[in-house]
């Protein structure tokens, strides 16, 4: 996933019901390469249509691609080796409630095959209400989707408190929640309206396991010089610092490793503890709230001016990185 200097943004989820794979064939082998190339050559949703029309077939793609551009375009593409189905978010027939959601199955694929149906139920219900009330924002998506622990099939929400001590053990099984133990990031691209400069497109980026990660704003303009160290891969870490800190906390959450399959057990009490107020998510979301507050005032100024202030970005990054580092140091040293 990513965005480019034209304000074109692209994300994908692996679909599991569009292609009948054979033997040891890798599903969606070209999915990542397609994103990389499309960000190089596309500026609009229409460009992406042309891109899909003209790439060689079979394409080795099996994915749902979400696309937005700086001209007001927004669409979802379900793509297999030879064809694609497009769903226009500006067309009430395709998006009657103003949004399109996907997990790991495609509407154009085989019925009841694929993955992520229970997660889709949760995303759809959350987005429907938020769309009706005009409350879909980047911060909302991180808090209410990326950190959702509601399972619609079981009709439970771990955040209700009923699964914490003393009512329960404080442990639960990681099954069909939107954030999974394998989730490596959460990204929200905040696009621009027609007439606004594409450089104002903001890619809110959370690296690592979303319930233990903190989102930060990134911009394409001068990114080669300005991108903060906390999102850059470093030799001293196996990942960028933001990802490393998040995953170290996640390792404590998924800490039961006594035999096969036990990695699915979630130390919910450590992640969220409403009685004591000291779970990781409480500290993480408070820190992220401050990131959004700090960035909001600058974004408002830049939108009024009509362009980014690249002189102010390094100072913002230094301030954010300093405060985020302190939060993680405190959490990592607490046990």
Regions found by a protein language model. Give the residues of each.
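A conserved hydrophobic secondary-structure block that centers on an alpha-helix together
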Residues: 43-50, 55-56
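Short arginine-rich
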Residues: 57-63
